[in-house]
């Protein structure tokens, strides 16, 4: 009687109902209760986790045109596998997620706080924005464009292959794309930010403050602006 399960506007809701005082049949402390549920569904288009909730999934979910996920607090999602036209994943607080996905058109990921994620994604357009002390590891496949925007003390490690790569680092952020082969790349670093890229074609660089940019491969630098105190070097 203390757990309600119902559907609201197409959403499955599992809810604790606070026991009434004085009823012997409900004389337990809700703080000692752990809610666990096994749910089987053919599609997963929207996911929201908060608090200390945890999600573990099995098979791949089809999400149709769009998948939207949001995690906050100390929540976590494990084994999440999704396919859709477009996808977006937002993590904040100390939340964490591991995701394997196929998004035919585009995938956007936003991390803040102390959140962390491990992602393997196949998509034409992959973009990630990280702030705070967040950390992300991303493997990209069949990417036409990959965008990495970092600030604060955030970190990103990116691997795979992409046609175009755009990296922006500020603060004490660090981008490691040594395992990502890019045909063309644009890198902009400021503050104490750092970026390391692997490029086979054209590379443009802007580095200011005490930032550093390192590159490998057969990159041909087509434009560079390196300020006093900043550095640009070949690996």
Regions inferred by a protein language model and the residue ranges of each:
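Acidic (Asp/Glu) and glycine-rich low-complexity loops/linkers
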Residues: 1-72, 76-92, 96-112, 118-129, ...
């Amino acid at each position: 009687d203390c757990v309600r399960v119902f559907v609201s506007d197409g959403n499955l809701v599992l809810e604790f109902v606070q026991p009434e005082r004085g009823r012997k049949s409900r004389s337990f402390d809700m703080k000692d209760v752990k809610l666990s549920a096994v749910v089987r569904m053919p599609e997963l288009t929207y996911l929201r986790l908060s608090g200390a909730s945890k999600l573990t999934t099995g098979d791949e979910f089809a999400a149709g045109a769009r998948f939207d996920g949001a995690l906050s607090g100390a929540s976590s999602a494990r084994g999440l596998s999704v396919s859709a036209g477009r996808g977006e994943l937002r993590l904040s607080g100390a939340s964490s997620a591991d995701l394997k996905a196929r998004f035919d058109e585009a995938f956007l990921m936003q991390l803040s706080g102390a959140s962390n994620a491990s992602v393997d994604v196949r998509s034409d357009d992959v973009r990630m924005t990280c702030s705070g002390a967040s950390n992300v590891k991303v493997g990209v496949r069949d990417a036409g464009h990959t965008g990495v925007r970092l600030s604060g003390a955030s970190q990103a490690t990116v691997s795979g292959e992409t046609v175009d790569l755009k990296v922006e680092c500020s603060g004490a952020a660090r981008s490691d794309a040594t395992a990502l082969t890019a045909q063309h790349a644009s890198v902009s670093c400021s503050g104490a930010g750092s970026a390391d890229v692997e490029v086979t074609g054209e590379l443009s660089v802007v580095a200011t403050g005490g930032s550093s940019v390192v590159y490998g491969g057969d990159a041909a630098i087509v434009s560079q602006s390196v300020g006093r105190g900043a550095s640009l070097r070949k690996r």
